[in-house]
Amino acid sequence: MTQLCLNEAVYQCEPGESVLDALTRQGVSVPSSCRSGVCQTCMMQSADANVPSIAQNGLKSTLQAQNYFLACACHPLEDMTISLPDSSDRLLTATVTALRQLNDEIICVGLDCPSLQDYRAGQFINLYRDAEFSRSYSLASVPSDSYLRLHVRRLPDGRMSNWVHDQLKIGDSLQISAPVGSCFYLPGAAQQPLLLIGTGSGLAPLMGILRDALNQQHAGEIHLYHGSRDAAGLYLVDELREMAGHYPNFHYTPCVSDSTATSAHQSGRAVDVALAAHPDLAGWRVYLCGNPDMVKSARKKAYLAKAAMNDIHADAFVRVAAANQ
């Protein structure tokens, strides 16, 4: 058993227990969201130099050098003296500038954040309802847009998503984190074909990636497959078809798994439809966004279809357990 010293109080950390779980078990409130080392909401700082390297995966080198770590991924092997970072140093103030219902479940939230200097289309931010409650949402916008765009899907027991859908108003101010994440478009291989596969609101980062690639004159073929259980779950269909008509190298295929094929969409899961159309992905760059089970399965299938591992980029939308929504 190791000890955690926080604000001059000492807490016990059981063998194999994460710092986040240990503190939560003993009544300490630590901001958290995904609890899987992705969103970085639970970032803390150690006064010592004994931070396990795995607890710093995904953090910027400047943060690693200052002994910042992710509490959900830190399983200490020795005692640690830790602290929570000052939220004023890491959060940005944003104003709601637009609210647009995309379908029955998904709303597009527009945020103006003048202090945000730069980001990559397809990255994600943490949206804060209050100082301790946040959720991660991917950016559907590109840096040249006048405001950030998020696609927020309503979940039945989602404290954050229901608040966004039912209570958020244009003009409201809230706090967000700086964008993070590695699922974005990089120029430099303009002829490389791109395969984008998403489910549900996983279309959000793919929209950002798609628009960014087209804005940077990507010349290779770009194929986007967006899947839903039924046709009502699809959205931005007209906009995407219009883009496909405007850009000869862009092809859009909506997919519905619980329906037969029609002139409006293909029948089947997006990943299956995509890989049936593109069985050999050697030399392709692949982006996978949405349901984590789909992302996990599609990553394996893309690799077996000869896509290089370093050409497979993923953003899995991990749903928080109902008790913590």
Where are these regions (language model features)?
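Ferredoxin-reductase
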Residues: 91-173, 177, 192, 228-230, ...
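Structural motif
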Residues: 193-195, 223, 285
